[in-house]
């Protein structure tokens, strides 16, 4: 009898049958006590965000960053001439084209070179006065050589000129050799042509 019941019972597979899923849906619909929210809560997960933050992002964690205890960049105050320009810009008067044009011409009339560079040049002039005449000459020659060495634009132009000159010379040599070869071929053809014409004349006279 055990063998007969085993043969009548279907073999269960791993996958769910369509009939079993539809029967479970029908059974859940028949149970009025369960709400839709309970069904959704079974299918979805709830995250405890506060415990995640406490675990992975604690308040005392520094993430490998460190604070820099350096002073901020020093501030250079403006020169007295620039303070007037600043006070003009702080006024609330409306800018007309005439006022703007006057301010632009006044700014253009001032030195175009920044004031810090003027100070830098003055300090370099002091260094030159401390040097002996021989050292000054060496320094001047060194600066000239450095300018020539780092003048890459000029070097590129010179290299291009030399290359183009070499190419032109090669083309001229090729043309001259071709014309010389062509002339020699023409001379040979003309000499052969004159020889054959002489032979034809001799034959015609002898006959």
From Swiss-Prot:
One of its GO terms (molecular function) is protein phosphatase inhibitor activity. Residues 149-152 are annotated as: Required for binding PPP1CC catalytic center, displacing metal ions and inhibition of PPP1CC catalytic activity. The keyword Flavoprotein does not apply. Residues 80-91, 123-132, 168-177 have a biased composition (Acidic residues). Residues 35-44, 112-122, 133-145 have a biased composition (Basic and acidic residues). Phosphorylation on Ser-44 by ATM activates PP1 by dissociating the PP1-PPP1R2 complex. Phosphorylation on Thr-73 by GSK3 activates PP1 by dissociating the PP1-PPP1R2 complex. Residues 19-28 have a biased composition (Low complexity). Residues 187-207 have a biased composition (Polar residues). Residues 1-44, 65-97, 110-146, 165-207 are annotated as: Disordered. Gene3D superfamilies: 6.10.250.1050. Keywords: Acetylation, Carbohydrate metabolism, Glycogen metabolism, Phosphoprotein, Protein phosphatase inhibitor. The modification Phosphothreonine is found at residues 73, 92, 96. InterPro entries: PPI-2 (IPR007062). The modification Phosphoserine is found at residues 44, 87, 89, 123-124, 129, 132. Residues 12-17, 43-55 are annotated as: Required for binding PPP1CC. The keyword Acetylation applies. GO terms for biological process: glycogen metabolic process; intracellular signal transduction; regulation of signal transduction. Belongs to the protein phosphatase inhibitor 2 family. Heterodimer with PP1. Inhibitor of protein-phosphatase 1. This is Protein phosphatase inhibitor 2. It comes from Bos taurus (Bovine). The gene is PPP1R2.
């Amino acid at each position: 009898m055990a063998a007969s019941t085993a043969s009548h019972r279907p073999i269960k597979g791993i996958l769910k049958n369509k009939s079993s899923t539809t029967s479970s849906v029908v059974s859940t619909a028949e149970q009025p006590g369960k709400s839709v929210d309970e069904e959704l809560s079974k299918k979805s997960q709830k995250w405890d965000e506060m415990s995640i933050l406490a675990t992975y992002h604690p308040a005392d964690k520094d993430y490998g960053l460190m604070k820099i205890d350096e002073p901020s960049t020093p501030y250079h105050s403006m020169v007295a001439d620039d303070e007037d320009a600043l006070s003009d810009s702080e006024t609330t008067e409306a800018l007309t084209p005439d006022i703007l044009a006057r301010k632009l011409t006044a700014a253009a009339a001032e030195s175009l070179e920044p004031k810090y560079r003027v100070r830098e040049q003055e300090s370099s002039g002091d260094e030159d006065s401390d040097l002996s005449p021989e050292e000054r000459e060496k320094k001047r020659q060194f600066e000239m050589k450095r300018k020539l060495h780092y003048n890459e634009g000029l070097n590129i132009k010179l290299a291009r000129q030399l290359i183009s000159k070499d190419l032109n010379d090669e083309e001229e040599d090729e043309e001259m050799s071709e014309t010389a070869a062509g002339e020699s071929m023409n001379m040979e053809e003309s000499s052969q042509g004159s020889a054959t014409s002489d032979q034809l004349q001799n034959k015609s006279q002898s006959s």
